[in-house]
Amino acid sequence: MSSLQPTLTNERIGVLDVLRGMAIFGILFVNLAHFSYPDMYLSMLGKENFFMDKWSEADFAAADILKFFIQTKCILLFSFLFGFGMVVMMERAENKGKRFVPLYVRRLMALLLFGTIHAFLIWDGDILTEYALLGFVLLLFRKAKPKTLLIWAVSLYLLFSIPFMLTSFDQSNGQEWVQAVTQQAKQAIHVYGSGSLKDIAEQRIHDRLVYMSSNGMLTYNPLNYFFASIPYFSMFLLGAAAAKSRYLHEPEKHRKGLKRLWMAGLVIGIGAQVLYSVTDKEICLLIGAPFLMFFYVTTVVYLYHKTRVRTVLQSFSAVGRMAFTNYLMQSIVCTWIFYHYGLGLYGKVYPAAGVLITIAVCAVQMVFSHLWLRVFRMGPFEWLWRSATYLSWQPIAKKTKV
């Protein structure tokens, strides 16, 4: 019996790497706001705040475009692919006669360690820790049938959405609160833009703890945290359902279902996003984001199986194969660009310029990923992660042909 090893190139589902590469780039377009200015605090203040007063029309246009097409959609896509990946890994382990649960627990523990280091030592906006913690809950659903996973996913998502349907969530606050949050934002601009390494480290930890408080991590009530994370977890379940249904393995056998999903994504996704742009109601985003995400997925799946277009889409494949490395490198590069220990541009770059910086970083990552994978089988952080998962150092260099 052959030993269980990480998925190799010839065993991969090509369109997944393309989708993963697109998702990791889309996430950077959204995350750049948090890299370059105190977006977490400014979002609490709403549209009327001291920082947005400096924006030009181009900045507002750039922010609106990102909000319409990318915000929330790409992180939901990445969550969908996470759930999909668990099933692929489980099926492969079972085919090799290996126990899956211990393997996946080690994988999640390693991810949790990486995420914690990332969150407190590099960038406070880390999502890896949440994925790792939710991954343990996902394990409970590993044997569920696709229909069961679908029912759970939809039910949980509706449970999360109901409060937004029943109330307008008036976020008006007293003047003292506004002044306190404004001061927090100004402090972040000062520290990240001109502070010492010690100051930046303390600010990063402070901001991370604020974030963890806002999403329920620090309430010491797992239910509070899980409720705040339902959108991600629902996509985990949908991804697992799609993998078990073989929707992306064998798309030609699911043409009708994929076409219906494409139409629903187009009509409902675009329609809800238009309403969100006009009304700014969160419920419209909650409806529109997953549908628009599935519109993107089905469009890419369809185009990927068109020979001429596949060549273009495959340019994202190397990025997707190194998604873990690229995600972490985005944090390392962008904090260097914006924090004082690097170029010190924090608080000086607005959305329009931020889009250009994002495009430049993505272009460099695409070239780097292609060059790296010419020599190596996987990215450097993928190598560390998989070595921890399989409890042995994995071969990383490609075998040279004699």
UniProtKB/Swiss-Prot annotation:
Q: Which cysteines are joined by disulfide bonds?
A: none
* Family matches, as Pfam families: DUF418
Q: List the protein's name.
A: Uncharacterized protein YxaH
General function of this protein: Involved in transport.
Q: How does it sit in the membrane?
A: Multi-pass membrane protein
Keywords noted in UniProt: Cell membrane, Membrane, Transmembrane, Transmembrane helix, Transport
Q: Can you tell me where the transmembrane regions are?
A: 13-33, 68-88, 108-128, 149-169, 223-243, 261-281, 283-303, 327-347, 353-373
Show the InterPro entries listed in the entry.
Answer: Bact_Transport_Assoc, DUF418
Domain of life assignment: Bacteria
